[in-house]
């Protein structure tokens, strides 16, 4: 049986940074090839990088949010591209702006079907939201690590709120441990 931790896959990394000064987004949008800026639809300028694939949301305040990256390394690489593009436009950017990972979304697979009704009862209502008429997944809020896991009947998981990739591994360990204690997992992990 495959170890569920071996199935963990990073789906999205969101990080934030800033250049410490306000920007004229209209002007930046005209000079930055490939930039999308439609302030009636979204207050930020969107600049997409292809390699690595991500989107930088650049705001008038100078704050920048990078989303869509598949690793923390990709976030840093993507933002370095954005910083270089801004420098080319004569916009001063520090040599090494601080980049903060805000959220890592991962997927995993426990490798077996889950009885979500039994899990909801077994884990107790204080950390669980399960309304199958509204959403097919069970929402499990973990304290340590501080993440939210979505459990689906197929055994698939989505873990969100992590700040580092190891948070997903810790969450899978906690979930396997709790479900095993309750006798709700057949696998021997």
Swiss-Prot record:
Lineage of the organism: Archaea, Methanobacteriati, Methanobacteriota, Stenosarchaea group, Halobacteria
NCBIfam families per record: PRK00394.1-2 (NF001593), PRK00394.1-5 (NF001595), PRK00394.2-2 (NF001597)
Purpose: General factor that plays a role in the activation of archaeal genes transcribed by RNA polymerase. Binds specifically to the TATA box promoter element which lies close to the position of transcription initiation.
Organism whose genome encodes this protein: Haloferax volcanii (strain ATCC 29605 / DSM 3757 / JCM 8879 / NBRC 14742 / NCIMB 2012 / VKM B-1768 / DS2)
Keywords attached to this entry: DNA-binding, Repeat, Transcription, Transcription regulation
GO biological process, one term: DNA-templated transcription initiation
Signal peptide: none
PROSITE patterns: TFIID
Name of this protein: TATA-box-binding protein 1
Pfam families registered for this protein in UniProt: TBP
InterPro entries (UniProt xref): TBP, TBP_archaea, TBP_CS, TBP_dom_sf
Sequence repeat copies, ranges: 10-86, 101-179
Similarity comment text for this entry: Belongs to the TBP family.
GO molecular function: DNA binding; DNA-binding transcription factor activity
SUPFAM superfamilies per UniProt: TATA-box binding protein-like
């Amino acid at each position: 049986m495959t170890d569920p931790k071996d199935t963990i896959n990073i789906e999205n990394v969101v990080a934030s940074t800033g250049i410490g000064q306000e920007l004229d987004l209209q002007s930046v949008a005209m000079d930055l090839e490939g930039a999308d800026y439609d302030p009636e639809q979204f207050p930020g300028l969107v600049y997409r990088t292809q390699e690595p694939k991500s989107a930088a949301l650049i705001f008038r305040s100078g704050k920048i949010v990078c989303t869509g990256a598949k690793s923390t390394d990709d976030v840093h690489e993507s933002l370095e591209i954005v910083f270089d593009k801004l420098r080319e436009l004569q916009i001063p950017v520090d040599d090494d702006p601080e980049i903060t990972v805000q959220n890592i979304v991962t997927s995993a697979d426990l490798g077996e079907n889950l009885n979500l009704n039994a899990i909801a009862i077994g884990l107790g209502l204080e950390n669980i939201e399960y309304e199958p008429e509204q959403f097919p997944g069970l929402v499990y809020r973990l304290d340590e690590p501080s993440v939210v896991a979505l459990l689906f009947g197929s055994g698939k998981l989505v873990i969100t709120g992590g700040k580092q990739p190891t948070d997903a591994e810790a969450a899978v360990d906690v979930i396997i441990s709790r479900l095993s204690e309750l006798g709700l997992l057949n696998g021997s992990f």
